[in-house]
């Protein structure tokens, strides 16, 4: 009788095979990730050593130094101007207002409408419509895409800190940002390194559904890892305290800039976008040249402290990158 009771206790205390298999898989994946991280660190060390021994021409050093000094001077001008605005010392400033310059391409075959000349400037040569407006300080939803900055420029420390704060460390990544009076000066500092625009609801939904990723730690997992956001149960588990139970609630909260906008925004990882043109073939090289020409028309750099923030048609850009 006692032997049968002992056998029952042993069967009850034994772990199911599924749990044991999950633990083995979790241990194996953890070891594989540690090995991959170790290999990545070793490759980075080798790359740093090879870059140290790399020959650098004197002309490239001079060009990089001059470009970086110009960029530092631009950021210094912007910082001084914003400091004067904060202290209300706008007597000797050309304009104490904040401006946004919206640049869009003309629609083919579109009829020219009568537009106020003070607010809109049109140039028939390049086929672009430029509309300069005054920012009134009202909150607005922006989508910011990190792009390559000016040629041969080492990003100054202040601009890099702002990019890190916005989680835009890598190129071809994007985040949602709520534009306010406090955010506007930061956008002026990082203007050469980003593309800014106001997304539509369809673009917001497409981004979150196709490229939404989060950091999640499941059961029997040693470390959190990045997963695709395609499970409403995970959303309810992580954001249920804020009244958000599905992906559609996240889309609505971001589109309307609700009370839980920052919670939803930081719950999502920065969106990793595709390159507009990739590859090294002859046709791809031609497309890259055309892309640079188009960017030179829309992305107009200015070293002036009072330069407006440039806004582009972000929906058309996301249609190419998403």
From Swiss-Prot:
<feature type="modified residue" description="Phosphoserine">
    <location>
        <position position="14"/>
    </location>
</feature>
<dbReference type="GO" id="GO:0000465">
    <property type="term" value="P:exonucleolytic trimming to generate mature 5'-end of 5.8S rRNA from tricistronic rRNA transcript (SSU-rRNA, 5.8S rRNA, LSU-rRNA)"/>
</dbReference>
<feature type="compositionally biased region" description="Polar residues">
    <location>
        <begin position="1"/>
        <end position="16"/>
    </location>
</feature>
<dbReference type="GO" id="GO:0022625">
    <property type="term" value="C:cytosolic large ribosomal subunit"/>
</dbReference>
<dbReference type="GO" id="GO:0003735">
    <property type="term" value="F:structural constituent of ribosome"/>
</dbReference>
<dbReference type="Pfam" id="PF00327">
    <property type="entry name" value="Ribosomal_L30"/>
</dbReference>
<keyword id="KW-0007">Acetylation</keyword>
<dbReference type="InterPro" id="IPR016082">
    <property type="entry name" value="Ribosomal_uL30_ferredoxin-like"/>
</dbReference>
<dbReference type="InterPro" id="IPR036919">
    <property type="entry name" value="Ribo_uL30_ferredoxin-like_sf"/>
</dbReference>
<dbReference type="InterPro" id="IPR035808">
    <property type="entry name" value="Ribosomal_uL30_euk_arc"/>
</dbReference>
<dbReference type="GO" id="GO:0003729">
    <property type="term" value="F:mRNA binding"/>
</dbReference>
<keyword id="KW-0694">RNA-binding</keyword>
<dbReference type="InterPro" id="IPR018038">
    <property type="entry name" value="Ribosomal_uL30_CS"/>
</dbReference>
<dbReference type="InterPro" id="IPR039699">
    <property type="entry name" value="Ribosomal_uL30"/>
</dbReference>
<feature type="compositionally biased region" description="Basic and acidic residues">
    <location>
        <begin position="26"/>
        <end position="45"/>
    </location>
</feature>
<dbReference type="GO" id="GO:0003723">
    <property type="term" value="F:RNA binding"/>
</dbReference>
<keyword id="KW-0597">Phosphoprotein</keyword>
<dbReference type="GO" id="GO:0042134">
    <property type="term" value="F:rRNA primary transcript binding"/>
</dbReference>
<comment type="similarity">
    <text>Belongs to the universal ribosomal protein uL30 family.</text>
</comment>
<dbReference type="GO" id="GO:0030687">
    <property type="term" value="C:preribosome, large subunit precursor"/>
</dbReference>
<keyword id="KW-0539">Nucleus</keyword>
<dbReference type="GO" id="GO:0005730">
    <property type="term" value="C:nucleolus"/>
</dbReference>
<keyword id="KW-0690">Ribosome biogenesis</keyword>
<feature type="region of interest" description="Disordered">
    <location>
        <begin position="1"/>
        <end position="52"/>
    </location>
</feature>
<feature type="modified residue" description="Phosphoserine">
    <location>
        <position position="278"/>
    </location>
</feature>
<protein>
    <recommendedName>
        <fullName>Ribosome biogenesis protein RLP7</fullName>
    </recommendedName>
</protein>
<dbReference type="GO" id="GO:0042273">
    <property type="term" value="P:ribosomal large subunit biogenesis"/>
</dbReference>
<feature type="modified residue" description="Phosphothreonine">
    <location>
        <position position="120"/>
    </location>
</feature>
<comment type="function">
    <text>Involved in the biogenesis of the 60S ribosomal subunit. May act as a specificity factor that binds precursor rRNAs and tethers the enzymes that carry out the early 5' to 3' exonucleolytic reactions that generate the mature rRNAs.</text>
</comment>
<dbReference type="GO" id="GO:0000463">
    <property type="term" value="P:maturation of LSU-rRNA from tricistronic rRNA transcript (SSU-rRNA, 5.8S rRNA, LSU-rRNA)"/>
</dbReference>
<feature type="modified residue" description="N-acetylserine">
    <location>
        <position position="2"/>
    </location>
</feature>
